[in-house]
Amino acid sequence: MGPSSCLLLILIPLLQLINPGSTQCSLDSVMDKKIKDVLNSLEYSPSPISKKLSCASVKSQGRPSSCPAGMAVTGCACGYGCGSWDVQLETTCHCQCSVVDWTTARCCHLT
């Protein structure tokens, strides 16, 4: 085998290494551009009308505690460690334990 054959055998693997690398690089750049274009088209645009969440706690003696008009229950707490409660008509917390000394309703509305 002559020197030109040896040189050819050395150059072929080197050319294969160079060519796929540049192809992969251009494929990566094309994919990056496509991903950026899609993300830019999905950009979040907030509504010009902004709302504020206002909340208050209403504590009552006994088992029920109701929110003021226009507010809705978002959570309840019951005295004597009672962890069993339900919301009635979206505006009233009702503790389900037989003995409860107080009930608190967390009431919120959007302004």
Curated annotation (Swiss-Prot):
- Location within or outside the cell: Secreted
Transferase among the record's keywords?
no
Q: Which InterPro entries match?
A: RELM (IPR009714), Resistin-like_sf (IPR036262)
Q: Which Gene3D superfamilies match?
A: Resistin head domain
Q: List the disulfide bonds.
A: 55-108, 67-107, 76-93, 78-95, 82-97
Would you kindly state one Gene Ontology biological process term found in this protein's UniProt entry? Answer: epithelial cell proliferation
Keywords attached to this Swiss-Prot or TrEMBL record, sorted alphabetically, are: Disulfide bond, Hormone, Secreted, Signal
Top-rank taxon of the source lineage equals Eukaryota
Q: Which GO terms describe its molecular function?
A: hormone activity
Signal peptide (from-to): 1-23
Checking Pfam families in the record gives: Resistin
For whether the record's keyword set contains Secreted, the answer is yes
State the GO CC annotations: extracellular space
**What tissue expression does the UniProt record report for this protein?**
Expressed only in the gastrointestinal tract, particularly the colon.
Self-association and partners: Homodimer; disulfide-linked.
Q: What is this protein's function?
A: Probable hormone.
Q: Which family does it belong to?
A: Belongs to the resistin/FIZZ family.
This one is known as Resistin-like beta
